[in-house]
Amino acid sequence: MRRDLYQARITDDSVETYLKTFGAVCIEGPKWCGKTWTSAYHSRSEFYLADPTGNFQNRKLAELDPSLVLEGEAPRLLDEWQEVPSLWDAVRFAVDLSKEKGRFILTGSATPNQKGILHSGAGRIARLRMRPMSLFESGKSSGKVSLKGICSGSLESQLTGEVQLSDLIDYIIRGGWPNNQDLPLEQAALLPKEYISAILNDDIERIDGVKRDRHKMELLLRSLARNEATTVSNKKLKDDIKDIDHEDIVVETVATYLDILNRLFLIDNQKPYGAELRSTIRVKQAEKRHLADPSLACALLNASPEMLKNDLNTLGFLFEALCERDLKIYAESFGASLYHYQDYRNREMDAVIVTPEGEWCGIEIKLGANQIDEAAQNLLKIKEEILAENKGKEPKSLCVVCGLGNAAYQREDGVFVVPLTALGV
């Protein structure tokens, strides 16, 4: 590969750290998010399982004798290893024998059936999740404001520049796909649509050889798009399909198909948080639903820029999804985790970031600057309720991430305000 053409990714540091720590690293994530490019950058030799040359001779060789494809300068890239699941055990065994660090990099766009893998690889093969590009990685955010700094309670007030609504809509429809960043928006919108087609026409059967109902899977994907950034249950998805598409799908099928989409890394849900914040008030445990990139929801909804301008409710959910995609990428780069918060008093925080030290930061996400006051008051109210508990833990900071803002600053009530287009690691 042309290393001088490589576009740096936030996960690069983690890849280097993992290679120094483990015998092998498995980089997982949705197709087309840049896994192969990043892995090739960090490797010294490569083997591509999906190469069609010679009627897929690479895959046939790996199936014949997995150990043969492991020979090469380290780190050696085994791209799309799930095409031959037995490679996992071959890598684990090779790592066990040599005890050397950084021998292999595996990439995977799907998780094969566990029955095809004899050992977990724990302690030998470390898993690293990769996602589409954040706005900072694609150059759409200046990165002047550090999320790590916010989570430690510090923010330097500064002007960040004007942002147009049309820009935010562009970022949502375009998505974080590396090959999409320099295309005109009309062309860029085609990639996530093609992604969905590839999933439906090939991947849902190829993952384990089981034939599935393509139409029902498409209905489920459309329902997930309509319910992006919400905490609806599987039954609500079933009911949504019945109400909108007038078709019946049993809940068990919904659950089975969601598992397939999860194994294809098409789903990237946000876990609930709350048990560590308070002791007596009941906290909801539903995950917030997300597709791997908000552009996929746009593709499934056939959402054009004009449609989103005229449907600010849908745009609001998609902007929230955009923010939470980026927050997860930034947070994981310094060992933090992204959650969301809902309790049975109907109090919500769009995002909660928990640092490795156990500190937490509450975040509200708002598209318009006119919503900042309400969002800040909501955060302060939740903080007040949490601290009223005997074991309530004070947040390190509270923050409103907004779309249409031109400055990062701290309000008189202590709440930070940061435009998404200024946020970075």
For each predicted feature, which ranges?
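N-terminal pre-Walker A segment at the start of P-loop NTPase domains
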Residues: M1-E16
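Conserved lysine of the Walker
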Residues: K35
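Hydrophobic positions on the alpha1 helix immediately C-terminal to the Walker A/P-loop
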Residues: T38
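Short glycine-rich substrate-engagement loop in P-loop NTPases that contacts/grips substrate
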Residues: E46-P75
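Conserved catalytic/switch belt of AAA+ P-loop NTPases
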Residues: W88-A110
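Interdomain motor-coupling "hinge/lid" segment immediately C-terminal to the ATP-binding subdomain
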Residues: K115-T230
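Accessory nucleic acid-recognition modules appended to NTPase machines
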Residues: L185-E359
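Domain-level recognition of nuclease-like catalytic cores that cleave nucleotide substrates
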Residues: G403-V425
